Amino acid sequence: MWPFASVPAGAKCRLVETLPENMDFRSDHLTTFECFNEIITLAKKYIYIASFCCNPLSTTRGALIFDKLKEVSEKGIKIIVLLDERGKRNLGELQSHSPDINFITVNIDKKNNVGLLLGCFWVSDDERCYVGNASFTGGSIHTIKTLGVYSDYPPLATDLRRRFDTFKAFNSAKNSWLNLCSAACCLPVSTAYHIKNPIGGVFFTDSPEHLLGYSRDLDTDVVIDKLKSAKTSIDIEHLAIVPTTRVDGNSYYWPDIYNSIIEAAINRGVKIRLLVGNWDKNDVYSMATARSLDALCVQNDLSVKVFTIQNNTKLLIVDDEYVHITSANFDGTHYQNHGFVSFNSIDKQLVSEAKKIFERDWVSSHSKSLKI
């Protein structure tokens, strides 16, 4: 019936936030807890979750979400949680607590063993979905600032479920040739909506390149294209910008996104605001990169601030016309090696709402000048 139904603006997407209780402002949007709770409550057949790690019991709200998942799994709802092979530290405890939930570890890069599953998304019944930067941890649900998108528009949920199928094909318990065969079966139906065919102004982008499949857009290509075509403004709220790729303990320069930001400021006079995180999960290069951008563009309209409370929001807005929400840092290692799905939209309402979030964060008491 989808081809004959009118497509709602923004594909019925709503922004979703987690805000720690010690912040000096509150959100007008659905909370991550409310979003996950609604997905669980409305599920009739299945709930699929992809996350680097799974540690929901670390906070009270995370534990409540996990208990609800356990409850519906006991009633026959199929629950599958994908997590990275290197993020399974709490797996034994969770399996003993909830035997009806199927936990699957994946290794998306058995050949080189450098790629991780970074994707943070939920899909249920091919009807509802969440994608953003909230992993399936108690912190992301309760105590760490995150941003994501919830939609109950079935075509969009179905398209995201295709990504789940692809990641699931890299089950680390399978032999490599089975992984390849399984993944190959996913590729022909890998996506329906992309930058040239958005639905309601919305589409997904993917990483890394070897997992793209048929007609998917590489996240790096879209981000860099948007940065290079920016005319008036670029607003970035990210945990880190790191112009390197790490392989076997060695660092290699990866300036693609970094250079695109500098070129926009110096060559085209684009107004750029960069709000970076500053907590113990940051890469050692992150603050150095922020300072170098500030120094190189001292004669240009580029401003850098540091967010002082744990902030895993990863948001890009270009020319007030395009919004990008992802689970990856602007980091060469993430973009070259790791597996994730990003949300993109040119819908005016969604871009406007995301812009208001950035403006709120930018002027808040938690945002400090880099020079202080």
UniProtKB/Swiss-Prot annotation:
Any one GO MF annotation of this record: hydrolase activity
Family annotation (Gene3D superfamilies): Endonuclease Chain A
Annotated keywords: Host endoplasmic reticulum, Host Golgi apparatus, Host membrane, Host-virus interaction, Hydrolase, Late protein, Lipoprotein, Membrane, Palmitate, Viral budding, Viral budding via the host ESCRT complexes, Viral envelope protein, Viral release from host cell, Virion
Primary gene name: OPG057
Name by which UniProt lists this protein: Envelope phospholipase OPG057
InterPro entries the record matches: Diverse_PLD-related, PLDc_3, PLipase_D/transphosphatidylase
UniProt domain PLD phosphodiesterase: residue ranges: 307-334
Organism: Monkeypox virus
Group of enzyme by EC: hydrolase
One Pfam family per UniProt: PLDc_3
Recorded superkingdom: Viruses
Record's comment describing the protein's domains: Late-budding domains (L domains) are short sequence motifs essential for viral particle budding. They recruit proteins of the host ESCRT machinery (Endosomal Sorting Complex Required for Transport) or ESCRT-associated proteins. F13 contains one L domain: a YPPL motif, which might interact with PDCD6IP/AIP1.
